[in-house]
């Protein structure tokens, strides 16, 4: 994927950034419209070097199986599962596309990017155990959460989670929601395969090239200004469509584009850190993604988790996140990123968040004050016998949370992702963080439908081959869910027991 020497002047599609979002959109377009030319510009010298890198993101295969922030408790003690169902539906779409891509040779060797790992919710204390029981009662009978277990027996806990059981005082009640069918996704490896496919099929890749400006032309195309960061060479590229998949850098470019849809948006950067286990014996004692419950008043990003990862076919173990603060919008960004993002059209939104999100400010202050002993103290809630010498602190990627205008409040902080697309469909971008990468496919399908409404009608047949459930809520169609689940499990090598054949799956879906 070396740089091209010839200066390119025209292309059909420009992808800004070589992360999971651009890679997904590019791979979709390659399948749907192979005659369109695609040029990808990445400011760094490698694919997936920012938030898509496996050590820079949580990589949970976000499907709301274990993340408690998606299942808030109501005042009457019941649990609201709407967000969890929505996130899981989105992950099923991504999973289907990955399976299709494996069948088509777009992706190879699934175990390089996806592996089966149980997803587990963990709480302690009588009140929290009661909540987790209510969560189980709300989810266990649901199509998308079938097989979930509720565990409150110390012996069973100890058998399944020996690292977490060692040294634990079980006089304090514990409870688990255990989902055996969870996955770990290495989005770095996945992105590299998708970008490789785009390159092999004629897409042009420019690394060390930074997009510095975007100007719309009278024919609705865009003039994209690009600088080679190594040589200083500047070039302009004229493109019919631009996708800004630049992670934390997307806000700046969308602002520079001048589209009205980007006005009022702001970004709040939060840096992340994790403790990474360096003791192979401890890593071998834990094989699950275990998510806890955020402290009262703490933001969703603070949910602690002891997280098995599979990176480069090797298991690893992380605990965190610990929050920090930096004005940079990218891990390898600039300290001027935050102040440079403040504009007349979003300053009220930014100031509004400063007033309304005092809980976040308090959380960040407490996190910044933590030393090594404080971080190990947090870890011991999960692994009571944890010792500092077995863990190292690593810096993860920057998370830029979306700030959006809100009537009467100035602005509110949104913990999610938002697709921003121009009314004429000529440019789109993605803002925000979690659940992020796990919902890349539905997010990019949204981009396609909003930006190419005419072409989208003609693409529906092909899209149904890629995502058999497209246009259908699996929640309402258990039979279809069973088919696509069995098919994708087999193709992605997640179910060694085997499953039904894939050929008839797409044929069972009604026209969307």
UniProtKB/Swiss-Prot annotation:
GO terms for molecular function: 2-hydroxyglutarate dehydrogenase activity; L-malate dehydrogenase (quinone) activity. Keywords: FAD, Flavoprotein, Oxidoreductase, Tricarboxylic acid cycle. Its EC number is 1.1.5.4. This is Probable malate:quinone oxidoreductase. Belongs to the MQO family. It comes from the Bacteria. Gene3D superfamilies: D-Amino Acid Oxidase, subunit A, domain 2, FAD/NAD(P)-binding domain. PANTHER family: L-2-HYDROXYGLUTARATE DEHYDROGENASE, MITOCHONDRIAL (PTHR43104:SF2). SUPFAM superfamilies: FAD/NAD(P)-binding domain. It comes from Rhodococcus erythropolis (strain PR4 / NBRC 100887). NCBIfam families: mal_quin_oxido, PRK05257.1-1, PRK05257.1-4, PRK05257.2-1, PRK05257.3-1, PRK05257.3-2, PRK13339.1. Pathway: Carbohydrate metabolism; tricarboxylic acid cycle; oxaloacetate from (S)-malate (quinone route): step 1/1.
